[in-house]
Amino acid sequence: MIAELFTNNALNLVIIFGSCAALILMSFWFRRGNRKRKGFLFHAVQFLIYTIIISAVGSIINYVIENYKLKFITPGVIDFICTSLIAVILTIKLFLLINQFEKQQIKKGRDITSARIMSRIIKITIIVVLVLLYGEHFGMSLSGLLTFGGIGGLAVGMAGKDILSNFFSGIMLYFDRPFSIGDWIRSPDRNIEGTVAEIGWRITKITTFDNRPLYVPNSLFSSISVENPGRMTNRRITTTIGLRYEDAAKVGVIVEAVREMLKNHPAIDQRQTLLVYFNQFADSSLNIMVYCFTKTTVWAEWLAAQQDVYLKIIDIVQSHGADFAFPSQTLYMDNITPPEQGR
């Protein structure tokens, strides 16, 4: 019986052993070489070999079922299993190629968020197409599948409203692009501030400034305001200089000197608003407003530029013989009778 089995399926057995040998040789060859060479050709050839092996094995099993009158299984079941295995392998290979494409786009400098959303949309499309083709292959009508999908979608929607809300909000985040991975964001409505680490289908992961992970449901972003300081073009420097009242005669000169210093400062963006004006009589000081923008948006560089501006302001004030005011009170005493000398 075994001899007859081998004789009648010699071609299938040769195909199986030859395909397995080809897989082993391919794996050995690519393991010795560069892993980056596992591109479209590698996966296509590997998928073809897997398909040949599965088809040959299925053919042998069907031969055994038909010739030995096996009752516990039918050729239709074997065809279903083989087709399912081929569909799963095809899906895996396509997903691997999509992941490689996504990594290549990111390495080329493309936006991470855009690359990921395109990758996920293509994966979802592949799954839907394969399910429809798979069902049609086994005699299910396309209209029936779509009707079943609509009813199932309605049931899932009613049972998982919050999940679907997060899902569709995640899609809108990808298309509206209020922020991208790596952006610093914060919300004045909620206690949310940090760097965007990941935008998922259901939640967005934010790393706070003390390196704690914060997971925010995507649906929340549709009902709150989100500020994206990471996309600002400049950073602002604003402060108030308080001079003493006895330095009133020097205020105008100091204002002009500070304004000139800012106009010539290499870190200050001259295309943006630059204001230096005496603007307030305070209780203990004559206040000068300073308002300008740096060219950089990097926090550390902005702090260095702001420090340099402040130090130069101190030098200007002191070089003009003036000084900074501090809260003080002056007590005037008039017509005071000295106490009588004790006898």
UniProtKB/Swiss-Prot annotation:
Pfam families: MS_channel_1st, MS_channel_2nd, MS_channel_3rd. Keywords: Cell inner membrane, Cell membrane, Ion channel, Ion transport, Membrane, Transmembrane, Transmembrane helix, Transport. It is found in: Cell inner membrane. The keyword Ligase does not apply. It is a multi-pass membrane protein. Residues 31-40, 99-125, 169-343 are cytoplasmic. One of its GO terms (cellular component) is plasma membrane. GO terms for molecular function: identical protein binding; mechanosensitive monoatomic ion channel activity. Coiled coil: none annotated. Residues 1-9, 62-77, 147 are periplasmic. The chain crosses the membrane at residues 10-30, 41-61, 78-98, 126-146, 148-168. Its main location: membrane. Homoheptamer. Belongs to the MscS (TC 1.A.23) family. Mechanosensitive channel that protects cells against hypoosmotic stress when highly overexpressed. This is Low conductance mechanosensitive channel YnaI. It comes from Escherichia coli (strain K12). The lineage of its organism: Bacteria, Pseudomonadati, Pseudomonadota, Gammaproteobacteria, Enterobacterales. The gene is ynaI.
